Amino acid sequence: YLQGAHSNRFKAPTLVRAIFSSGLFAEGWAVYTEKMMADAGFGGPEVHMQQLKMRLRVIINSIIDHKIHTKGMTEQEAMAMMMNEGYQEDGEAAGKWRRACLTSTQLSTYYVGSAEVEGIKAAWETKNKPNLLKMNDEILSFGTPSPKCIKRSMGL
């Protein structure tokens, strides 16, 4: 919600920037902030464990997305990986299978996007003193472009 609110306030310099946003950044930002809050102790160990479980799902979803579209992964193989290694319920895994078959790369946006945001954070911290509030506010100030555009706009 916070990222969306910031994006709505952003005054795009071009019509293209106003119309198009980056799912890679939006989904990656969500995963990044979930991890950031759990790392800060929000919700205690229970929330941290849940965040780790969700992180595992994000990684597995990215793996199956890749394997379905480039390695011929079967539905049975994907379902087994999601349920046995990712602790996903049958209904959730079946829905992910359908999504992966209909949209290539969408399931990967969560993991790849969060890795890109973590990369922005690492680059920012090499040039600045660690200050999550300042860094996060600067990241959000650019709306919802690709992480690559944000990194460039931040001079990183």
Where are these regions (language model features)?
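N-terminal maturation segment of proteins
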Residues: 1-156
